[in-house]
């Protein structure tokens, strides 16, 4: 059986076809094609024989030498025992951590070494220095450098950190891995600017290459030799391609980097920083202090905003005046009566506004108060004052149309009407006596009307008596019976202009009516 056997493949057919096509054109194939063909055929061989087989040792499962090749051996650190209670164990661990700086694993290992004897372990803790599990800044930097060189090969990383165990390296790797994704704003901006600059450089390179053809020499450099041209019908084989080094590899624009956005470099600043070694540290300290002060301002602003937001969430309900749940009461107190009179003086007959001012009275109750207490509080004069203020003329009389519509009359007029009705019922004048001329009227004021002449009673029955006579200037006219003439009236000599319906001079008082009949015999 031959030691080497070639395996036919599709690549050999491709090589033969490419070789057959290139030989007639060039005369002889290139050496590069030959070398690629040899490498390809060498890779496609199957090696058979004892020289290419691995030596497998015999299996010895119970042999102690099976685990002798391992460098790291597991060591039992802790095994619980019923002789040590949980409270005693917690007290021992707390003392070991606070007084001697041991961690839990080291303290339990010491206790297991002394066979769960707490007194011996406490006495022996001071004789040893605990192995530090903390990572200093130098250890972290060395770990990052070693990880960049070796990757996840923790055995090689341990060679750079000999005081760290592999489990400790693995544990720190997973905690360090979580912080790698946190990039600052400056780093992200630098990456963006770097990507843009690379794109601009590539565009400039393409423009520069477009001016010079691939096979022609550069006219600016006469010493440069032209590149060898390939035949048009030549096809490259599957061999390895030569890496062509570009003449624009060391381009100045590609190697130039700019600081991130917001950072500027000035010659004065670089000179000042490089002048003395302490000046750089002082500058950085000043920048750090400014950064800390700005962070404090931001924190104080956040606290202020949060307090204002909490104040706004409460709403304006605490600031609203308390709403009194007043119940409507029909009983009028003295204060409410005085308040109602003042409200009538202010709002007139706007009973809705008056009810809102009082608070515990309805619109109907206010109207009832106005009717009931009109004479007691002289509300008509109060209304006249309010109307005078509204019209702009004090003491304006009530119009005739309003009186006909049922507007209330002034209080003095109503009192006089009552007096006239009372006197007409209680007194009687005999018909046989002719009426004497009226006495001269006393001096009257403008507010009171002139006196009336008391007429005699008619012969009609009491039920058919006429209403008492009124003055001519009154608004209410007497009702006349259908079969009886009106009673005699007297025209007043001086009528007040306020009560007269028609302005102008009036004649002296004269009797109006028919002559009186003889009186009937009294019963």
Curated annotation (Swiss-Prot):
InterPro entries: ELM2_dom, Homeodomain-like_sf, REST_helical, SANT/Myb, SANT_dom, Trans_reg/Corepressor. Keywords: Coiled coil, Isopeptide bond, Methylation, Nucleus, Phosphoprotein, Repeat, Repressor, Transcription, Transcription regulation, Ubl conjugation. Residues 460-482 have a biased composition (Low complexity). Residues 1-43, 185-264, 387-523 are annotated as: Disordered. One of its GO terms (cellular component) is transcription regulator complex. This is REST corepressor 2. Residues 248-260 have a biased composition (Basic residues). It comes from Homo sapiens. GO terms for biological process: negative regulation of DNA-templated transcription; regulation of transcription by RNA polymerase II.
């Amino acid at each position: 059986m031959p030691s080497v056997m070639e395996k036919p493949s599709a690549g050999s057919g491709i090589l033969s076809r490419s070789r057959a096509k290139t030989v007639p054109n060039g005369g002889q194939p290139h050496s590069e094609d030959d070398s690629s063909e040899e490498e390809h055929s060498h890779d496609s061989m199957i090696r058979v024989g004892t020289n290419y087989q691995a030596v497998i040792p015999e299996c010895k499962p119970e042999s102690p030498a099976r685990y002798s090749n391992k460098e790291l051996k597991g060591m039992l650190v802790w095994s619980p025992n019923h002789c040590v209670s949980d409270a005693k164990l917690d007290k021992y661990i707390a003392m070991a951590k606070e007084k001697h700086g041991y961690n839990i694993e080291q303290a339990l290992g010491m206790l297991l070494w002394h066979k769960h004897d707490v007194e011996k372990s406490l006495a022996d803790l001071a004789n040893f220095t605990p192995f530090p599990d903390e990572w200093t800044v130098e250890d972290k930097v060395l770990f990052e450098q070693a990880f960049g060189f070796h990757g996840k090969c923790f055995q090689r990383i341990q060679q750079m950190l000999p005081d760290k165990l592999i489990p400790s390296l693995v544990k720190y790797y997973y905690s360090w891995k979580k912080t790698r994704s946190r990039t600052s704003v400056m780093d992200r901006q630098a990456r963006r600017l770097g990507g843009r600059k690379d794109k601009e450089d590539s565009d400039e390179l393409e423009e520069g290459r477009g001016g010079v053809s691939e096979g022609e020499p550069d006219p600016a450099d006469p010493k440069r030799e032209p590149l060898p041209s390939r035949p048009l019908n030549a096809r490259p084989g599957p061999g390895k391609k030569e890496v062509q080094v570009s003449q624009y590899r060391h381009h100045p624009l590609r190697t130039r980097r700019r600081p991130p956005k917001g950072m500027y470099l000035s010659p004065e600043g670089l000179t000042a920083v490089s002048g003395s070694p302490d000046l750089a540290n002082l500058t950085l300290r000043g920048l750090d202090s400014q950064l800390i002060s700005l962070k404090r301002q931001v924190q104080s602003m956040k606290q202020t905003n949060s307090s204002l937001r909490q104040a706004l969430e409460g709403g304006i309900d605490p600031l609203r005046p308390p709403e009194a749940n007043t119940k409507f009461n029909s009983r009028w107190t003295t204060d409410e009566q005085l308040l109602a009179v003042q409200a009538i003086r202010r709002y007139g007959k706007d009973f809705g506004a008056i009810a809102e001012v009082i608070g515990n009275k309805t619109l109907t109750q206010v109207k009832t108060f106005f009717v009931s207490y009109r004479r007691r509080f002289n509300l008509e004069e109060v209304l006249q004052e309010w109307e005078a203020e509204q019209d702009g003329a004090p003491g304006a009389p009530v119009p005739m149309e309003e009186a006909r519509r049922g507007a209330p009359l002034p209080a003095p007029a109503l009192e006089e009407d009552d007096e006239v009705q009372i006197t007409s019922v209680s007194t009687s004048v005999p018909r046989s006596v002719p009426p004497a001329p009226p006495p001269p009227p006393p001096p009257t004021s403008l507010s009171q009307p002139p006196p009336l002449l008391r007429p005699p009673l008619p012969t009609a029955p009491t039920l058919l008596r006429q209403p008492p006579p009124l003055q001519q200037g009154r608004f209410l006219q007497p009702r006349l019976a259908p079969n009886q003439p009106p009673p005699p009236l007297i025209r007043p000599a001086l009528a007040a202009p306020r009560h007269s319906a028609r302005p102008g001079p009036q004649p002296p008082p004269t009797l109006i009516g028919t002559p009186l009949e003889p009186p009937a015999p009294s019963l």
